[in-house]
């Protein structure tokens, strides 16, 4: 009941739109834009109370607001071609991603009238605090893929992507990640003709590839300096000092302390994977027995 006037509001808008074009046979061009926007608002009251052995004469209000924006745009072109027993398709594209977050808060004590209509930070006369921050990052990607098969027996796929992230310094902002896979559908060979009643489909495959990970703090590469006044309860040592030379003076020039050492050599985490395997289907019963082994 005491918290009945506290408020928490959350608005979110998200969606995407795309354009799809087929200028010539076999060529498809698609562009997509997506947006995710959220806004949070919070207002909490602290009121005096006297309940049994518990009591407090403090009155205060805290207001918080946060805005989050995430958008994505990409453009991808694919082209398919089939000539005789040769069949292939190629894909090329790029993508941009951006995320931003802004937040701020205000706290105030000491109100003459204890009602929600009056208790805003500007109306208080007691202790006040304010805080806020912002963050964000950008990611740009270029990618391409080539698929080729001959007579549905010999299969090749090659992928290449290059990603750049604002989370890394100029030394390692971009990284390249290739992958390749090969397949041989043995069941399509002439020497397997006599086994078709038992082995409906048999394929061996091998793949090698690299992927990247940029999941670090947005500002991990920067040196960060902060001013610390040493206030609080209990008091803590800070970077400011009393310019008057007296304990408890009001002139406090602030110094700075480095809380994080920058490193422009931070780079993408790269994972390399190798895979070999075999897929098979038996007794010409699709869906009845389909299995595979891989390493």
List each model region and its residues.
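Extracellular/periplasmic, surface-exposed regions of secreted and cell-surface proteins
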Residues: 1-46, 56-295
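N-terminal, polar/charged subdomain of small-to-medium soluble alpha/beta proteins
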Residues: 52-53
């Amino acid at each position: 009941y005491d918290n009945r006037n506290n408020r928490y509001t959350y608005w979110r808008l998200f969606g995407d739109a795309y354009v799809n074009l087929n200028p010539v046979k076999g060529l498809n061009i698609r562009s997509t834009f997506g947006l995710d926007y959220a806004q949070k608002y919070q207002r909490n009251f602290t009121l005096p109370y006297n309940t049994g052995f518990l009591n407090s004469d403090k009155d205060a209000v805290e207001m918080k607001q946060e805005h989050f924006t995430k958008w994505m745009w990409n453009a991808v072109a694919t082209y398919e071609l089939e000539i005789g027993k040769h069949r292939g398709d190629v894909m090329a594209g790029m993508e941009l991603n951006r995320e931003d977050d802004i937040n701020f808060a205000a706290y105030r004590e000491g109100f003459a009238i204890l009602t929600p209509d009056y208790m805003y930070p500007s109306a208080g006369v007691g202790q006040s605090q304010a805080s806020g921050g912002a963050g964000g990052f950008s990611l740009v990607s270029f990618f391409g893929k080539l698929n080729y098969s001959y007579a549905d027996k010999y299969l090749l796929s090659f992928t290449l992507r290059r990603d750049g992230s604002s989370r890394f310094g100029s030394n390692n902002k971009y990284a390249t990640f290739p992958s390749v896979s090969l397949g041989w559908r043995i069941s399509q060979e002439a020497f397997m003709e006599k086994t078709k009643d038992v082995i409906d489909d048999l394929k061996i495959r091998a793949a090698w590839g690299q992927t990247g990970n940029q999941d670090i703090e947005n500002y991990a590469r920067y040196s960060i300096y902060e001013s610390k006044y040493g206030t609080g309860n209990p008091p803590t040592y800070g970077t400011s000092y009393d310019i008057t030379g007296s304990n408890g003076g009001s002139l406090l020039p602030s110094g700075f302390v480095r809380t994080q050492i920058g490193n422009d050599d931070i780079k993408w985490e790269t994972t390399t994977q190798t895979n070999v395997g075999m897929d098979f289907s038996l007794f010409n019963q699709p869906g009845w027995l389909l299995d595979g082994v891989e390493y």
